[in-house]
Curated annotation (Swiss-Prot):
Extent of the signal sequence: none
GO CC, any one term: chloroplast
Any one GO MF annotation of this record: metal ion binding
Protein purpose: May only reduce GSH-thiol disulfides, but not protein disulfides.
Classification via NCBIfam families: GRX_euk
Main location: plastid
Family to which the UniProt record says this protein belongs: Belongs to the glutaredoxin family. CPYC subfamily.
Gene source species: Arabidopsis thaliana
One Pfam family from the record: Glutaredoxin
Residues bound to [2Fe-2S] cluster: C95
Protein's name in the database: Monothiol glutaredoxin-S12, chloroplastic
Gene that encodes it: GRXS12
Positions carrying N-acetylalanine: A62
Length: 179
């Protein structure tokens, strides 16, 4: 699993170690070429803090040049991100509910792909609007497991308290074909 934050304003992924940065708009293309350092399993893997200049690629601002296509392009990006990563949490750094969900996953030794919306500038609020369109939920955290929308903090904690979260995580791990 990958723990990361995305900074669309600077177009780089950041996290806790010193692996190279990966541009957000390159996710689907790079992953298909086998260059993205994601392991599709529930074991912790971390991609790192930006240590070189971002590669040249189309930016979210470029993708958002027309209002009619920006929503659909961001929607495609969200759908691809959710489909290609077993656990994704759209979060805000200052949100206590987001912190609770991230702590829960950490206690389960699951490191989700974390997208910190408040660190993305205007793209963060655009992504939050796209998430509302897709899920009907505007608040964070917005949790996806195995490509399915789980809900927010209370939904995730409720699944955990009922003993159902681990089974959902195991199923998501199985979908990704690795243990």
């Amino acid at each position: 699993m990958v723990a990361a934050t995305v900074n669309l304003a600077n177009m780089t992924w950041t996290s806790l170690n010193s692996n190279p940065a990966i541009s957000f708009s390159m996710l689907s293309g790079i992953r298909n070429l086998g260059m993205l350092p994601f392991r599709r399993c529930l074991k912790p893997t971390v991609i790192g803090i930006a240590s070189w200049p971002p590669l040249r690629c189309s930016s979210v601002k470029a993708m958002s040049s027309s209002s009619s296509s920006s929503g659909s392009t961001l929607e495609e990006t969200v759908k691809t991100t959710v489909a290609e990563n077993p656990v994704v949490v759209y979060s805000k750094t200052w949100c206590s509910y987001s912190s609770q969900v991230k702590s829960l996953f950490k206690s389960l030794q699951v490191e989700p792909l974390v997208v910190e919306l408040d660190q993305l500038g205007s793209e963060g609020s655009q992504l939050q609007n796209v998430l509302e369109k897709i899920t009907g939920q505007y608040t964070v955290p917005n949790v996806f497991i195995g490509g399915k929308h789980i809900g927010g903090c209370s939904d995730t904690l409720q699944l955990h308290n009922k003993g159902e979260l681990e089974a959902i995580l195991a199923e998501a791990n199985g979908k990704n074909g690795q243990t």
